[in-house]
Curated annotation (Swiss-Prot):
It comes from Stenotrophomonas maltophilia (strain R551-3). This is ATP synthase subunit beta. One of its GO terms (molecular function) is proton-transporting ATP synthase activity, rotational mechanism. Its EC number is 7.1.2.2. GO terms for cellular component: plasma membrane; proton-transporting ATP synthase complex. It comes from the Bacteria. It holds the Pfam family ATP-synt_ab. Belongs to the ATPase alpha/beta chains family. The gene is atpD. The keyword Transmembrane helix does not apply. SMART domains: AAA. InterPro entries: AAA+_ATPase, ATP-synt_VA_C, ATP_synth_F1_bsu, ATPase_a/bsu_AS, ATPase_alpha/beta_chains, ATPase_F1/V1/A1_a/bsu_N, ATPase_F1/V1/A1_a/bsu_N_sf, ATPase_F1/V1/A1_a/bsu_nucl-bd. CDD domains: ATP-synt_F1_beta_C (cd18110), ATP-synt_F1_beta_N (cd18115), F1-ATPase_beta_CD (cd01133). It is found in: Cell inner membrane.
Length: 468
């Protein structure tokens, strides 16, 4: 084990000088003696000096402290011992339940599966959320992004998806909390505990209060744990199907931005690191399904200032199979989940994959909403009376569709007081098909707001009529 000494500390970036014949490799982990701090080598500056990122606070570090090269990259515990536990970026337990009893440890920097090992995803994954199942269906083993600005419901949507999929899905889940609120991580832990699925979830947190090194690497830690479950063959020679939840992928980029300038790189557009696309690619290419097992990932993506063309969300778009875009204008109407059905996309939107009935219904819903969007300006200036009968009918149906896209969530029960609803894909298609066919033109649009299936809307309309 070669030893070096710290020669410079600037924020989260630490320079360490080693003898020239034993300079550590890039991504080697260094341990600072008599401290808990691990450094990860990022650059070799020459003359035996390496520049590192500190995984942990650099408070209390000083020059001439000894750093020991471990000779390998950061390694974290993997396997069944991680289930039900909360760990930090280095795989150390932070739930005060004793050490993690893992059989093996893997390095967090790994190659993506080779081209011939990958397998395409076509099987649909039902979420129980109407707007998602109809307009941007998820694939089992696919990658999904939840895009939204501040406060439009990314985390609540993520929690509902976890509630609906992880609880129904008998496989394993990994949750990586990257630079988000500690409170949300705590809520997630209790949510899993209360629903008795904690023994199927591994949790890795590097939240907002952590130094940038932790936030930069915690996504890789969670991913490595998920990869182990996918790749480790059981007695039948198969890996497992794993769910990977990442909240929030933007903070991973942001942590890279924070240390990029300190590492001596020139900033690129909007001040992001010049290696933005590469860093995103390295992470995203590993989140994939192989012939062995699958990783289905759901990632929340913060959109700075609601600008989807910002380099960070724009770079993320390219890697995803489905994009769920949350809109502030829809949230302002009180329609939750605030998913924009015209802006959300899915690669599964193909009649050969989802079937003709689903595809046709989704297309007709989209056309109706698009027509309403185009007519909004005319309505704002001239009012509804100036529209043709055909246009009035389209507007009426579109407003019903908009309201029918809303749905009470299980995870929001404590706030709203109304019980959550899970709607099967079959019921979702049937309900929307009936609305665009005009079967419910006689019902008031309020009846469609915050209900589950179409039968509930009919029931609600009856109650409204009785009250009136």
């Amino acid at each position: 084990m070669s030893q070096g000494k710290i020669v410079q500390i600037i924020g989260a970036v630490v320079d360490v000088e080693f003898p020239r014949e034993s300079v550590p490799k890039v991504y080697d982990a260094l341990k600072v003696e008599n401290t808990e701090i691990t450094l990860e080598v990022q650059q070799q500056l020459g003359d035996g000096v390496v520049r590192c990122i500190a995984l942990g606070s650099t408070d209390g570090l000083k020059r001439n402290l000894v750093a020991v090269n471990t000779g390998r990259g950061i390694s974290v515990p993997v396997g069944a011992g991680t289930l039900g536990r909360i760990m930090d970026v280095l795989g150390r337990p932070i739930d005060e339940a004793g050490p993690v009893a893992a059989s093996d440890s893997w390095e967090i920097h790994r190659d993506a599966p080779s081209y011939e090992d990958q397998s395409p995803a076509t099987e649909l994954l039902e979420t129980g959320i109407k707007v998602i199942d109809l307009m941007c269906p998820f694939a089992k083993g696919g990658k999904v992004g939840l895009f939204g600005g501040a406060g439009v419901g990314k985390t609540v949507n993520m929690m509902e998806l976890i509630n609906n999929i992880a609880k129904a899905h008998s496989g394993l889940s990994v949750f990586a909390g990257v630079g988000e609120r500690t409170r949300e991580g705590n809520d997630f832990y209790h949510e899993m505990k209360d629903s008795n699925v904690l023994d199927k979830v591994a949790m890795v947190y590097g939240q907002m209060n952590e130094p940038p090194g932790n936030r930069l690497r915690v996504a890789l830690t969670g991913l490595t744990m998920a990869e182990y479950f996918r790749d480790e063959k059981d007695e039948n020679g198969k890996g497992k199907d794993v769910l990977l939840f990442v909240d929030n992928i933007y903070r991973y980029t942001l942590a890279g931005t924070e240390v990029s300038a300190l590492l001596g790189r020139m900033p690129s557009a909007v001040g992001y690191q010049p290696t933005l696309a590469e860093e995103m690619g390295v992470l995203q290419e590993r989140i994939t399904s192989t012939k062995n097992g699958s990783i289905t990932s759901i990632q929340a993506v913060y959109v700075p200032a609601d600008d989807l063309t910002d380099p960070s969300p724009a770079t993320t778009f390219a890697h995803l199979d489905s994009t769920v875009t949350l809109s502030r204008s829809i949230a302002s109407l009180g329609i939750y989940p605030a998913v924009d059905p015209l802006d959300s996309t899915s690669r599964q939107m193909d009649p050969l994959v989802i079937g003709h009935e689903h595809y046709d219904t989704a297309q007709r819903v989209q056309q109706t909403l698009q027509k309403y969007k185009e007519l909004k300006d005319i309505i704002a200036i001239l009012g509804m009376d100036e529209l043709s009968e055909e246009d009035k009918q389209a507007v009426s149906r579109a407003r019903k569709i908009e309201r029918f896209f809303s749905q009470p969530f299980h995870v929001a029960e404590v706030f709203t007081g109304s019980p959550g609803k899970y709607v099967s894909l079959k019921d979702t298609i049937r309900g929307f098909k009936a609305i665009v066919d005009g079967e419910y033109d006689h019902l008031p649009e309020q009846a469609f707001y915050m209900v589950g299936s179409i039968e509930e809307a009919v029931e609600k309309a009856k109650k409204m009529a009785e009250k009136a």
